[in-house]
C-alpha cells in the first residue's frame, strides 16, 4: 500500500517498479537540467544515475517514486536502510549519534509538483527516527531543503570516486 505523506497529502510514496524506469529516467534528466541551470555542473554527470543503477536499486527494493493522486510519477529517490559505506569516515565534523539510520540518495523531481522533498522525508522518517543525506557543495537547493527541514550539517564525506559531499543528519 502506498505511504501517504502527511506533509504533502496529495503525494504518495511507493516502491518503484521496472515499468517506472522511463518516467524515472525522465525525472532524473529534468533534475540534471535544473542543476545545470542553477550552476551545479559537477553533480550527476555523464547520465548519472544510469538506468542500470536505477534497475539495481529497484530490484534491491530501495528505489521509490512519489506519485500524485492520479498515479503520475513526480519524483524519485533511493532509500538505503542500514550502513552507508561512504559515511564510515566523516571529515571536518562528527555524526551526532551512532543510532541506526536510513540514507536518502538520488532525490529528484521533475519540477511539476511541490512537496517531493517533504514526501520523501516523511517516508524516510516512517522507517527510522534518524535520517542522513549528502549533497554536492554546488547543490544549494538541496542544502537549503535539508537545513529548512531540520537537518544538521555534520561534515564531509568522500564517494568511491573521491568526489566530496557535505553530509547531513536529522534525528
Regions found by a protein language model. Name each.
Residues 78-112:
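Conserved acyl-donor/pantetheine-binding loop and adjacent beta-alpha core of acyl/acetyltransferases
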Residues 159-171:
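C-terminal "cap" of GNAT-fold acetyltransferases
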Residues 126-138:
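Conserved GNAT acetyl-CoA-binding A-motif
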Amino acid at each position: 500500500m502506498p505511504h501517504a505523506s502527511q506533509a504533502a497529502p496529495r503525494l504518495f510514496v511507493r516502491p518503484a517498479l521496472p515499468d517506472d524506469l522511463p518516467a524515472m529516467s525522465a525525472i532524473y534528466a529534468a533534475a540534471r537540467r535544473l542543476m545545470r541551470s542553477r550552476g551545479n555542473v559537477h553533480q550527476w554527470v555523464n547520465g548519472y544515475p544510469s538506468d542500470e543503477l536505477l534497475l539495481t536499486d529497484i530490484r534491491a527494493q530501495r528505489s521509490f517514486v512519489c506519485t500524485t493522486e492520479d498515479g503520475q510519477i513526480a519524483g524519485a529517490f533511493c532509500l538505503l536502510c542500514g550502513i552507508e559505506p561512504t559515511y564510515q569516515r566523516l571529515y571536518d565534523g562528527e555524526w551526532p549519534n551512532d543510532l541506526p539510520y536510513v540514507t536518502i540518495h538520488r532525490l529528484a523531481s521533475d519540477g511539476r509538483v511541490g512537496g517531493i522533498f517533504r514526501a520523501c522525508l516523511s517516508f524516510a522518517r516512517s522507517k527510522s527516527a534518524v535520517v542522513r543525506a549528502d549533497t554536492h557543495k554546488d547543490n544549494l537547493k538541496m542544502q537549503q531543503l535539508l537545513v529548512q527541514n531540520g537537518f544538521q550539517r555534520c561534515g564531509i564525506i568522500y564517494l568511491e570516486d573521491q568526489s566530496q559531499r557535505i553530509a547531513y543528519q536529522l534525528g
